[in-house]
Amino acid sequence: MAKVDVKLPEEFLLKLSRLGNKTDEICEKALEAGGEVVLAKVKENLSAVIGSGTRYESRSTGELEQSLGLSPVKQDRDGNHNIKIGFSEPRSDGSSNAKIANIIEYGKHGQPAKPFLKPAKSSSRKACVSAMQQTLEEEVSKL
């Protein structure tokens, strides 16, 4: 029976220990980078659908677009880090931004659906993943 000792270079071991200490911080930066990519696409899609294809002149105040944003990165009880794109509440008139966004996304009786969230999610997936990978590589290379 043979015995093998593998000794890793000190520099590599130091990087691994630093990475272990800053994992949460690095993951948050990567999630924020990916979230910004998707947020930009959602804003672009929302601007395109508001007021388009209506019988009457749009009454849009721009409040829905302004309330769109990213949540801070939070960790759930399973240890997963999450970031969300959504609307801040409440509106100045007391109604819900989420309700208005839902009506635009899925439509209602007499108003056709104008999806802006689902197309943004599917079309920005690759760009989001690449932005997250790039940020992760940059942060790891700084160690």
Language model features by range: what are they?
Residues 1-84, 92, 98-143:
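Short, Lys/Arg-rich flexible segments
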